[in-house]
Amino acid sequence: MASAKIKKGDSVVVLSGKDKGKTGTVAKVMPKEGKVVVEGVNMIARHRKPSQENPQGGIDRYEAPMHIAKVAVADPKDGKPTRVRIEEKDGKKVRVAVKSGETIDG
């Protein structure tokens, strides 16, 4: 799989699925699986039975990984989804939003 242009800490917009349109910050990138974990998006509930460590039991809610193609980097200018281009500025490679031309990092 090609290297992802989405990095940990990026602000992203969900493009499809039950959370379409939501924005969040990337908590984890899994390039080998082609998935990302976005804070507050794609929440799942895990029902836990009471055990020795957790005598109460209960429901744990956490973010599940989602396919990297379902998210796009949010444009720093207006927050809408944009593609990312890599340019060289001052001898360093930086990521640039295609829509606005703003640098995402660097």
From Swiss-Prot:
Signal peptide: none annotated. GO terms for cellular component: ribonucleoprotein complex; ribosome. Gene3D superfamilies: 2.30.30.30. Part of the 50S ribosomal subunit. PANTHER family: MITOCHONDRIAL RIBOSOMAL PROTEIN L24. One of two assembly initiator proteins, it binds directly to the 5'-end of the 23S rRNA, where it nucleates assembly of the 50S subunit. One of the proteins that surrounds the polypeptide exit tunnel on the outside of the subunit. HAMAP family: Ribosomal_uL24_B. Belongs to the universal ribosomal protein uL24 family. This is Large ribosomal subunit protein uL24. The lineage of its organism: Bacteria, Pseudomonadati, Pseudomonadota, Alphaproteobacteria, Sphingomonadales.
